[in-house]
Amino acid sequence: EDPQVYYPEAILTVNLGASNALALVHVGGGATNEIYEVFAFIGCDAIYTTVDSNGTLEPAGFIVGASTQYAFGLACTPEGFVQRESWFVGSGDDWENEPWDITDDEYEYDPNRGHFALLSSKTIQLTWSEIQDQDISLCHFDCPGAGAGC
């Protein structure tokens, strides 16, 4: 069976296929800083981290922001290891911590770089308290033993 993440407070759960899943879980916070837990399952590897809506990050890997907008993603190295990555969302269209153009409906996907990322500019421009009302698109890539597609 495809691994699924079921959690009563999950505001975002994405099934990425045979052995990949992602969930964003709201776990608390106050009026100015909401706290989320991120669970990612890639093959047999489980990745967990905590993020908040002010962009604070622990441990390194995922970044989200409410006023300054970030996207988060995972990448597969040529050796088959899962690598966490993040990108700032601004203007331009380059990869890896370079600003992106959020006026496009979808960000370009570079299969030669082996990335998947959030592809909804409307979602990224919203605060995370509103994200549960939006459609999320994820693009993922060839990993040893896993399929590829968007």
Please tell me what each predicted stretch does:
Residues 27-35:
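His-enriched metal-coordination microenvironments in redox/metal-binding proteins
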Residues 59-150:
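Acidic, small-residue rich beta-repeat scaffolds with periodic aromatic anchors
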Residues 13-27, 73-85:
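Acidic/hydrophobic-patterned starts of short beta strands in beta-sheet-rich repeat architectures
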Residues 1-19:
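Short N-terminal edge-element motif at the start of the domain
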Residues 25, 40-41, 109:
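Hydrophobic side chains in beta-strands
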Residues 1, 47-56, 117-126:
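Beta-propeller fold detector
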Residues 35-69:
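Short helix-loop boundary/capping segments
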Residues 21, 36-37, 105:
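Residue-level detector of short, conserved catalytic/binding motifs and their immediate flanks
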